[in-house]
Amino acid sequence: MLHFIKSASNSQSWYNHDKVEICFIGRSNVGKSSLINSLSNSAVSKVSNTPGRTQLINFFEDDQKNVYVDLPGYGFAQMPKDKLEKMHQMIDEYLQNRKNLKTIVLLFDSRRGILDQDLDFINWAQQAKKNIILLATKIDKLNQAQKHKLLVSLKELNLEKSVLLVSSLKRTNIDNLKKLLASEFK
């Protein structure tokens, strides 16, 4: 079970601890908060149908004191441009400077596939030597033909073996994801 620790709007207010962290990032509305709730088996993270609701860095801990971080989504958000720029700077600062960060979990909506922004992020993470896990979310929304099309597109990008297909709603592959994340904390 995950427990909410705190929200942070800048590096001075980050959660101060000596453990490693796993962060969750992706475009707005891909299901980051829903996934955290699914991992927790409780509604520990606020969920919204409106893109861009998560605007702070949210820190959570599990019973073993492992730290999970929910980052705001990139892409669409309903906020003034200067506030959006400040939020993106906050995310960049966390990703580039956070010493506790061990693994980045990049979520993308399986209905949309991996978009250019996602590919840019994957390339940045690889160049920065960041450990990255890719999750295709909302897999329950796809029929068999759409799943096949997604897998073909992932194969074309050479990513078919490194993407886990998940559904927070149906809990598809959530237990496999928990095992994968547990191994990252070791």
Swiss-Prot record:
GO CC field: cytosol
GO function terms (MF aspect): GTP binding; metal ion binding
Listed GO biological process terms: division septum assembly
Binding site for GTP: 26-33, 52-56, 70-73, 137-140, 166-168
Species in which this protein is naturally found: Mycoplasmopsis pulmonis (strain UAB CTIP)
Disulfide bonds: none
Cofactor(s) required, per the database record: Mg(2+)
This protein's name: Probable GTP-binding protein EngB
